Amino acid sequence: MASVVGDDCNLDVMPPRKKKNKGSNKMQDKLNSNNNTGSKKSRKRKLNSNVNTVACKSQKRKLKKLEEDKEKEILFSKTAELLDKYKISEDVSSLLQSSKVIGRSATKLEKRRRAMQLSKAGVETEHSDESVEQNDNDDDSCMDEPTTPEHVEIETPTFVTDSEQQLVHADLMISAEESSSKLEVDDTVDMIPLTTCRDDDEDSMDGLIENEDVTVQGPRVPAFVVHVSRPAEVEETRKDLPIVMMEQEIMEAINRHPAVIISGQTGCGKTTQVPQFLYEAGFGSKQFSSRSGIIGITQPRRVAVLATAKRVAFELGVRLGKEVGFQVRYDKKIGENSSIKFMTDGILLREIQNDFLLRRYSVIILDEAHERSLNTDILIGMLTRVIKIRQEYYEEQQKSLQSGGTVTSECQITPLKLILMSATLRVEDFVSGKRLFPNIPPLIEVPTRQYPVTIHFSKKTEIVDYIGEAYKKVMSIHKKLPQGGILVFVTGQREVDYLCEKLRKSSKELVVQAAKRDAYVKKKCDDGSFGGVDMKEIAEAFDDDSNNQNSRFSSHGEDPSDIGDGNYDDDFEEEDMYESDEDRDWETVDDGFASSFVEEGKLDALRAAFNALADKNGSVSAEPAKSIAAENQEAEQVKNKFSPGKLRVLPLYAMLSPAAQLRVFEEVEKEERLVVVATNVAETSLTIPGIKYVVDTGRVKVKNYDSKTGMESYEVDWISQASASQRAGRAGRTGPGHCYRLYSSAVFSNIFEESSLPEIMKVPVDGVILLMKSMNIPKVENFPFPTPPEPSAIREAERCLKALEALDSNGGLTPLGKAMSHYPMSPRHSRMLLTVIQMLKETRNYSRANLILGYAVAAVAALSLPNPLIMEFEGEKKNESKDADKTVKQEDKQRKKDRKEKIKAARDRFSNPSSDALTVAYALHSFEVSENGMGFCEANGLHLKTMDEMSKLKDQLLRLVFNCCKPSETEDSFSWTHGTIQDVEKSWRITTSTSSKTPLLQNEEELLGEAICAGWADRVARKTRATEYQACAVQEPVFLHRWSSLINSAPELLVYSELLLTNRPYMHGATRVRPEWLVKHAKSLCVFSAPLKDPKPYYSSEEDRVLCWVVPSFGPHNWELPAHSVAITEDRDRAAAFGCALLQGEVLTCLKSFRALLAGKPETLLEREAWGLERVGSLVMVLTEKKIDTLESLRKNWEQNPNVLYSEIEVWFQKKFRHRVKDLWQTMLKEAHVRRS
């Protein structure tokens, strides 16, 4: 060390030496030469001190490492001694059996062999040969029949102290007291888990000491095991699943904690295996009371529910619909005694609304929690409270039982287990602030079985033409890299269709060029050249640069100029996709003859020629020359591996039909390469086999919602880092893969968010608020959401519900709001449906009521789903390159033109000038009555998938009308009384006549339009010019879409279901409304003027009340609507108006013939100045005191005293006619149907 730090030492600390580059490092030499003498001394002192410090730290690390090694050796030796001390003998170990035989019936030979082994070991057997022979018949029958789940009671893992150790194995039990010595446990080990299969030892375990650090729900009870007989192929497959190796760890965490979080990447097996772990542990078994509840598993998508339910049933060897069932929106298959139930999160949310404690369940698994769907977030918040409440109820019941009380089986409550499972779980959202869980649940991370995926970032990020860059990268992969499927992520259907069309065209051109080159090569071969290659051209190519030869025959056929300097340790390095114009232009083909050979893969003759030239020039190869046949065989292998063949390009997006989606799973021919162009639906929903390369554009189309204006917009935005990881993982499902990201690492690190926003932050929460209110949660802002919505969104939702009359002015739930909460749909749609039921209930004995209800349900389904009418030619700009128009062939243009004319004809066929919703409802009716639904959609330009889903939704809503709104559950005014569900379906199935395209009458269409107005009363627009409107919610003008059915009529007032911003704000789902509908169904949005004197107040015999006229102003823009009649609020004004109507004969018609006998005009009662007159003032005063302002109130007063108002009305007659009042009075009492006592 002294020699290193001596005074004469000029020490210089330098970084590690890099690889030698071309040229000298002039900058470093210049810096070294500029060092002066004065700085050397100070630097020397500084370096000396640094070296001493480094040496001291290094010695400490070495000493510390030596000490740690010694401690490990001591611990290892102690462990070995302890194991040797209690090692069982070989005679005893031979009696041990594998755990796989548990639950399997032994044969006669196996039982005798087992008895002989026990006898040799000196262990007495309980059963003799005779007992074995007696059970032979049973054993044989068990072998012939399929094995059913078997229940075996064992004790749960208990924890044993030093003084009570036991060694237990199946039929052989050796107590610690009989052992040669007593087990000594190290101080670092607190407990040892113990499992036994003997019922005789239960009493001996009661006194064992429990660990205080372990959270246990309730007292320790016997466990329950369900033995499963799986198919052989399932057992083989399960061995490769990482989560199977962690079964014990997972089940221990579930048994000890009320909530558990399991995190594992896609493919680890958590979705299918965790329910099986619980099933085998006794959950869902009716024979084990504390775990008899169903195992419930939620998925955010219906397709995942069906797939996982079928897979789990197959792996357990049971029938789907018996032990394992499922329930989705349109389908249900579950038995009464099912143990496992798969369902969507919306199904469980409806169940928790009816039974908050979820008494039917013992375990709830929320899968795909990282997606943060709206329903899943609500369920997490509710279930955390359910866990606590059920635990408290359980403890109370246990105390009651210990004190001698009794609890019926129906009222028995057991603890509930909650399991959150996710691929990329943001744990901080669930455990931060202890808002959800007072005690942080354990997090179990499951390793993945994913193959390694090499990530390639682009050096530059293309902002505009990223579709063009994706096309170039796909073609580059196809031409240069080995076989393997390519998955391309784009944003929407338009981009998918455009890129697919462009790739198919390029694939055809490659095939044509290959055919031409094959013909050219064949012609050269016929000329007698060496192996079909001109030796002169080969010699010139060889003499140009010998390095190019190595480049051409590199192991992967890539140009070295394309290799980047990224640090990647896989076979393929990061590629620079932007280096040369030659690489950017995929249409360019090399002119050189040898280049055409390389592109075609004709390497046999070319390599032989190069070998011959190399030998001629003295570059003798170390290996002997290969035969021509061997060279041809090797060249053929290279050709088959790297030659660019035909591309099989397939689209994949959500609106694609199921049959078209399944095409991506079909096998690809040997000479083809699969290319799937998909939206983000391929991130998690589907796993496409054979994908080796992923091209990620880094974009996604998101739907943004502005809670203040209610305007929605589709925008192309960057994906999150979590989504990027999901996309890259698609390349590593079947083998090592590569992901080419068309953006730089700087963009990924600095611009991409860590994860996407939860759905609750991006959608309206009016349905959430209504659900909370219906479950007696008045203050929604205090609910424990994992991510609470914005306060402004909550206020906007409450304003919307008040406009829909679901909430009163104080925020309380109205009877209408309670009925709306029973429907699993948006509050707007349920308001519309209930309005139809209310109005038809008021119209009694209407023969066509069932038909109107059928169309009402169809209109609700139409407004709930995207428009099924295909709009391919909206005029919106496609995201395509500049030469897109040049690439479209003339026949394609003509085909699109014909398609456009067909769609326009379909619009005219179904178009209803009053409502877009009724237009779609008519199309749905025609679709269902047609014999060929697929042909109908093809002929009329309709989306088959949307129409099919709309038909299913209509049927479900119709069942809800008859099941949800029963008189015992809701107000009787919301129940259907005009017929049964069969009557509605029969009326709906009628076919329209040729003279009319719709069976509905005009008044019936107006009734449905009024119901739509009730559901969207706060989304009103008023016409300003042509198709331009002013909406209530926004200041800027909005427009009717040119595909709307109302585009030609353009009514003065309309409501819309959606305001979508593209190049301008367009209204979708528009319906014409009348001004009186707004006042009737949206009074909270109206401001009324003072009662008008002209027209004067009047009495309505239909409503039996007096009304006055006012001028309403609607919405924030104060639109003045036509005069509207409302009830009079002032008591004296109301009494005076009723008295005027009574004298005019409007209340009792018998007075009309006596109007000429009156001494004054009845209208004077309406003038406050005339109330000073005796006959006017006395009548108004009595009417006010007696609260007589309706015919009903007048009748009740006359039944008590028939002479009420007699004197006050008599003075209104002229004196010479007052003698006729007595007879008139008897007629008035008779007409009022006064029942005299």
From Swiss-Prot:
Organism: Arabidopsis thaliana (Mouse-ear cress)
Protein name per Swiss-Prot or TrEMBL: ATP-dependent RNA helicase DEAH13
Further facts: Overexpression results in the development of a fasciated stem.
Catalytic activity: ATP + H2O = ADP + phosphate + H(+)
Residue numbers binding ATP: G264, Q265, T266, G267, C268, G269, K270, T271
Homology family: Belongs to the DEAD box helicase family. DEAH subfamily.
Domain named Helicase C-terminal: residues: 605-776
Pfam families with a match to the protein in the record: DEAD, DHX37_C, HA2_C, HA2_N, Helicase_C, OB_NTP_bind
